[in-house]
């Protein structure tokens, strides 16, 4: 399993990279976890949610927010700097339990990571994502093609959740968003620390049992990912 830190990447650019990585994993490549932040973006999932987007949203944000229609499942959500976005691109062929088990384990990685920073989180019956009480701290929306996942999870880290003042999390009226900064009694971790913690918890859950003797992975760079994709393309030729 390989992990990559893509820094701040636009939604459409990240989607293009995911599709390239997905094709590589479908061809037998290593499972990959992409960690990043998006600029202010409202994404509308396959379950719609367009009705939950104010018609003058871009005017309200002076044009500084992108609105995109996504291939992921779920309703409407938003992304912004200070939110960890995790896009696992992994094969489910050798994992038992199918998509439901995958979603459960992805939530579990977030719950364990949050515990490291003093935030008690859990699942909420009947509602996807990760919650602290009745406040939503992480949203999920995935897609699967030929047994390989893409899209994933958005987990709020920073204090500023102002975009959620306009967009209800996953279209759920009356649901408040929260973040690590709002829930922790200790110092707020920086994004590199959050990314590293999530990578480690994700690895412990998703790495095949026989590979746990291997050292924990470290986050590689966007350039490392581009080199990997170029090498894969040359191999195919």
Curated annotation (Swiss-Prot):
Pathway the protein takes part in: Protein modification; protein lipoylation via endogenous pathway; protein N(6)-(lipoyl)lysine from octanoyl-[acyl-carrier-protein]: step 1/2
One biological process term in Gene Ontology: protein modification process
Known catalytic reactions: octanoyl-[ACP] + L-lysyl-[protein] = N(6)-octanoyl-L-lysyl-[protein] + holo-[ACP] + H(+)
Superkingdom of origin organism: Bacteria
Active site annotation, chain numbering: 170
The protein's Enzyme Commission number: 2.3.1.181
Keyword annotations of the record: Acyltransferase, Cytoplasm, Transferase
CDD domains found in the cross-reference section: LipB
MF-aspect GO terms: lipoyl(octanoyl) transferase activity
Pfam family, one: LplA-B_cat
The BPL/LPL catalytic domain, residue ranges: 27-210
HAMAP family: LipB
UniProt similarity note: Belongs to the LipB family.
Protein name, entry field: Octanoyltransferase
Biological source species: Desulfovibrio desulfuricans (strain ATCC 27774 / DSM 6949 / MB)
């Amino acid at each position: 399993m390989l992990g990559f830190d893509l820094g701040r990447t636009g939604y459409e650019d990240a989607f293009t990279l995911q599709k390239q990585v997905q094709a590589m994993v479908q061809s037998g490549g290593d499972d990959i976890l992409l960690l990043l932040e998006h600029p202010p973006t409202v994404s509308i999932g396959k379950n719609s949610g367009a009705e939950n987007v104010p018609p003058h949203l871009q005017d309200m944000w002076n044009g500084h927010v992108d609105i995109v229609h996504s291939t992921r499942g779920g309703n409407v959500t938003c992304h912004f700097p200070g939110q960890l976005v995790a896009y696992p691109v992994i094969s489910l062929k050798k994992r038992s339990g199918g998509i439901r088990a995958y979603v459960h384990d992805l939530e579990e990685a977030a719950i364990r990571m949050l515990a490291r920073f003093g935030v008690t989180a859990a699942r909420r019956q009947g509602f996807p994502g990760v919650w602290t009480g009745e406040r939503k701290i992480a949203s999920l929306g995935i897609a699967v093609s030929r047994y390989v996942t893409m899209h994933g999870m958005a987990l709020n880290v920073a204090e500023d959740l102002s975009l959620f003042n306009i967009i209800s999390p996953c279209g759920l009226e009356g649901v408040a968003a929260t973040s690590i900064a709002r829930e922790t009694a200790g110092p707020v971790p920086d994004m590199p620390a959050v990314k590293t913690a999530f990578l480690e918890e994700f690895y412990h859950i998703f790495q095949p049992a026989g590979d746990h003797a291997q050292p924990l992975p470290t986050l590689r760079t966007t350039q490392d990912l581009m080199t990997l994709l170029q090498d894969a393309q040359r191999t195919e030729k």
